Amino acid sequence: MKNLNLSKLILKIALVVTIVLSSMQEVKAQFDVGADIMSRYVWRGAGYSNGPSIQPYMSYASGDFEIGFWGAYANDGQVDELDLYASYGIGPVGLTLTNYVFPDNMTPGTVAPVEYWASEGGWEGTIGLELGPIALTYATFFDAGSNYIAAGTSLGDVDLTIGLGDDFYTTDGDMGLMEISLGYGKDIMITEDFSLPASGSLIYNPDADQMYLVFGISL
């Protein structure tokens, strides 16, 4: 079983390396770091915190390739998150490989680094397609087989997203509508020379009959 898991990890790392090599070109590389402060962590129609969530990120981009870390931390007893991702754009198509990791689920000092990034069910592949004003997304977890399909568009200044999912996304595990989201963003002027990007989202999950109103600022 360990050999099988190691083989899976090697294949996943090989995919990341392939994306990196295919993106090597004479372009300006750029590092970036920042954070979003959200009133609540809501992802794909489900809430993952009961209160404010700090979501830092660190990334490196070169041309159409980007690799980075993204985290979510809430002081409310919920599970923290630290993800590794790599993405590459080819015209209207975007490819992303993400490893979702929840450090609180692991006992300190008992997990080797290679096992940390080989958590079962944590690797997800995503394909995005821009078709004019419509953005389509398909994502699947390689080990768990969970699927997520979404379509997004802009209605003036408001972004609309409709998502469907199966497995853990829905109460019965069958494919169903689990996300209807309306989002809006604006800059809040602090001084003449400084402003804070702010966003708000109204999210409804028809499957769970849950609604969220989320506000956030970006640093």
Regions found by a protein language model. Name each.
Residues 28-219:
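Outer-membrane beta-barrel proteins
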Residues 1-32:
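Cleavable N-terminal export/targeting peptides
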